């Protein structure tokens, strides 16, 4: 029998419940939007039970089972607990007040961020002792890709010679428009699609008339392209119209691919977009299916959200994936060269910057004075003999308007450009300026265009058989001076040729987003760099391509290169954690290119690359297989990190599924065991702790070498680390002090542990801040 206090509680609960029901019913006609209700770590292993609990929560608040079913978009039930549902703003606020709910936030959208890459990085298929052969090219490793889908007919998904599907694979091949289970094989072992979040936010979307396929099939080509880079099979004799010829393959060519399509083409806007709700569901399914590596070439824009904020769906999903042993690799973004633009900055994600290759597409321009200038283009049409060259400008005796600015060529009269090669200048950072200039000139009857622009922006294919050649402003000015000084200037354009090797330097791409990390300045981002400029890989047969292959540029292309390397490392070291894999990649990276030359960062002006451009450096796959020491981390480290940056204990507890109490005083974020040290606000001195784990020879002795940042003193204690059968982990302290007396920018150095076989290097990035939290505009 109930006592008086219990009876009162029941009555009050019923009253509150009925009032909530009534208010929810009254709001049913209000505008509903997709909201993600994040509940943290799942409390039950049975996914059906988890989903039922989600429906019960919605049912109790919406008033009926039918309304709950209509509202539900997704149930996240494998890697973590939560759901996406269509709710009014008021309904979302009420659900957010429930004690089991960590966050409720509106759905958000993400945007999409080879033949030479692997030979350039030293990952040779011809060397029988290489990492490729030591790991049997990634066999039995599953790379999950979240993107625009897959074109299964491409030869890069050929499963010839493949053994059985890995026993830990639990996924499947989902059917849909122009896609059925027969499109999967032993290479492409899984394909699923997630569209509910996209549909809920785009009610006018007409799936019948849409160009996109309502299935795992790729329309855009982006998903097929990045899958090729990560794990595509060998396809010989591939080129782009005769350029960049060779064998296309992925980093782990015998790894298995699972595609999770979460990005969709919106016909009305002519854009491809990815709902956070769909991405989270794709990650949830990938965790269930058994992927070993997740490759995500998507990103949001700054300002960023914190790591426990569900608004960054990739960060939240990645946290749960990493705790399950899945390495998550993400693109760093294409908003460079400005600082503070890098995205996907969570400390459990490997964030990737993009570099050029040692390859260019030289296009000879011969002026009438016999001077030869090597421009850049992807022009494979017939050579153009000596032809009149013009820079549209007012000669001083005309009332007509002339412009040599590329964007304004359309305002020139046709007779200005007809039958000529046109020189123009642009300050635009975008490849579209090149294409637009070519269109204007061709429309006017011109025969070619030379575009002078800032160096560093990726060369793109132009109009078919129409020469559009890029030069920098310096060379463009040389051509302009010749044009002005000659009575009858002419130019000859020859087809482009592929140059490979030492004459072509490696650079961090202009578009590659830069650090420092805007959300957590003590966490170095990006982590690592990989080639991402003019990468030749497979695409769909619905896109402009050659032989079903196309060249694309972006950190989207760099991230899957690291995913391929991570797959090889996982195949070689099955017991390594995602943090150990990241450490091995970062600490063994090249600080120079493979030929020993300095790596520059493109921009205005170009400069020597530093950790905010490329993290630890340019990935060195062979060295990463045997790093000697690793900076490892697990759940306890991530909890200490979240405590150190001020996240509340309740959020952390729900995130990890168990009670968390942060220490008082709270730990220092500088002690987070990253393979880097970044100090954003040093006033006088600080001492930092790191722990390294020996993964090399059992009995090893390492000695430290420090290259201190300019104006800083760095002391390491102890200076020697000794490992044996009983000592596999050792911690050391790093004391950093500044001699600067004013607020400074960042200075860079490095710390290296060396034995006779290994050099384990981490970057140091330090800024003096005598006056804290101060913005200086002077």
UniProtKB/Swiss-Prot annotation:
Its EC number is 3.4.21.-. Residues 34-113 form the Inhibitor I9 domain. SUPFAM superfamilies: Subtilisin-like (SSF52743). Its main location: secreted. PROSITE patterns: SUBTILASE, SUBTILASE_SER. GO terms for biological process: proteolysis. PANTHER family: PROPROTEIN CONVERTASE SUBTILISIN/KEXIN. This is Subtilisin-like protease SBT3.6. It comes from Arabidopsis thaliana (Mouse-ear cress).
């Amino acid at each position: 029998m109930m006592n008086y206090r219990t009876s009162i509680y029941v009555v009050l609960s019923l009253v509150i419940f009925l009032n909530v029901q009534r208010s929810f019913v009254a709001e049913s006609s209000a505008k509903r939007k997709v909201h993600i209700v994040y509940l943290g770590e799942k409390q039950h292993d049975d996914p059906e039970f988890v989903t039922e609990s989600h429906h019960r929560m919605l049912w109790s608040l919406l008033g009926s089972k039918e309304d709950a079913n209509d509202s539900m978009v997704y149930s996240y039930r494998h890697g973590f607990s939560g759901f996406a549902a269509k709710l009014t703003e008021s309904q979302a606020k009420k659900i957010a007040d429930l004690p089991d709910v960590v966050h409720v936030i509106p759905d958000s959208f993400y945007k999409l961020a080879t033949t030479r890459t692997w030979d350039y990085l030293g990952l040779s298929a011809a060397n029988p002792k290489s990492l490729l052969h030591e790991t049997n090219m990634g066999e039995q490793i599953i790379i999950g890709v979240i993107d625009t889908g897959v074109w299964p007919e491409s030869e890069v998904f050929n499963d010839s010679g493949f053994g059985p599907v890995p026993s830990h694979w639990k996924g499947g091949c989902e059917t849909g428009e122009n896609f059925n289970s027969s499109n999967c094989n032993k290479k492409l072992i899984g394909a699923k699609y997630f569209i509910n979040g996209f549909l809920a936010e785009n009610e006018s979307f007409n799936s019948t008339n849409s160009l996109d396929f309502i299935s795992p099939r790729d329309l855009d080509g982006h998903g097929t392209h990045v899958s090729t880079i990560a794990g595509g099979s060998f396809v010989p004799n591939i080129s782009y119209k005769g350029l960049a010829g060779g064998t296309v393959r992925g980093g782990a060519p015998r790894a298995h691919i699972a595609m999770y399509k979460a990005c969709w083409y919106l016909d009305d806007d002519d854009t491809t977009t990815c709902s956070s709700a769909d991405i989270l569901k794709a990650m949830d399914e990938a965790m269930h299916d058994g992927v070993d590596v997740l490759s995500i070439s998507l990103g949001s824009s700054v300002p960023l959200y914190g790591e426990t904020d569900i608004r960054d769906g990739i960060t939240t999903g990645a946290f749960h994936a990493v705790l399950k042993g899945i390495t998550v690799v993400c693109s760093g973004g294409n908003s460079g060269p400005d600082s503070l633009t890098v995205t996907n900055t969570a400390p459990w994600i490997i964030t990737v910057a993009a570099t050029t290759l040692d390859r260019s597409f030289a296009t000879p321009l011969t002026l009438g004075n016999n001077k030869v200038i090597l421009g850049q283009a992807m022009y494979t049409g017939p050579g153009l003999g000596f032809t009149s060259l013009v820079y549209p400008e007012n000669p001083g005796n005309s009332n007509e308007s002339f412009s040599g600015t590329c964007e304004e060529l359309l305002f020139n009269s046709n007779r200005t450009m007809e039958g000529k090669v046109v020189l123009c200048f642009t300050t635009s950072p975008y490849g579209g300026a090149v294409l637009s200039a070519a269109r204007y000139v061709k429309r006017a009857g011109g025969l070619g265009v030379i575009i002078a622009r800032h160096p560093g922006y990726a060369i793109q294919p132009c109009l078919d058989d129409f020469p559009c050649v890029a030069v920098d402003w310096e060379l463009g000015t040389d051509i302009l001076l010749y044009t002005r000084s000659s009575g009858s200037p002419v130019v000859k354009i020859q087809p482009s040729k592929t140059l490979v090797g030492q004459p072509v330097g490696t650079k961090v791409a202009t578009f590659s987003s830069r650090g420092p990390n805007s959300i957590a300045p003590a966490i170095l981002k990006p982590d690592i760099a990989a080639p991402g400029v003019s990468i030749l890989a497979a695409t769909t047969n619905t896109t402009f391509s050659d032989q079903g292959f196309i060249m694309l540029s972006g950190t989207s292309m760099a991230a899957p290169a690291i995913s391929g390397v991570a797959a090889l490392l996982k195949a070689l070291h099955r017991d390594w954690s995602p943090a150990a894999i990241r450490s091995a990649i970062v600490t063994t990276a090249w600080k120079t290119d493979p030929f020993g030359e300095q790596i520059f960062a493109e921009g205005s002006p170009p400069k020597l690359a530093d950790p905010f451009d490329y993290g630890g450096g340019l990935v060195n796959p062979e060295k990463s297989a045997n790093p000697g020491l690793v900076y490892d981390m697990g759940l306890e480290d991530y909890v200490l990190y979240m405590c150190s940056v001020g996240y509340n204990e309740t959020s952390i507890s729900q995130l990890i599924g168990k009670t968390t109490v942060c220490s008082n005083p709270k730990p220092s974020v500088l002690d987070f065991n990253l393979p880097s040290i970044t100090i954003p606000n040093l006033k006088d001195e600080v001492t930092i702790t790191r722990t390294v784990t020996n993964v090399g020879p059992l009995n090893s002795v390492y000695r430290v070498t420090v290259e201190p940042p300019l104006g800083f003193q760095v002391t390491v204690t102890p200076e020697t680390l000794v490992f044996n059968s009983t000592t596999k982990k050792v911690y050391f302290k790093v004391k950093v002090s500044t001699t600067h007396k004013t607020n400074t920018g960042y200075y860079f150095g490095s710390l290296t542990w060396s034995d006779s076989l290994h050099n384990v290097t981490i970057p140091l990035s330090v800024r003096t801040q005598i006056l804290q939290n101060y913005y200086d505009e002077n």
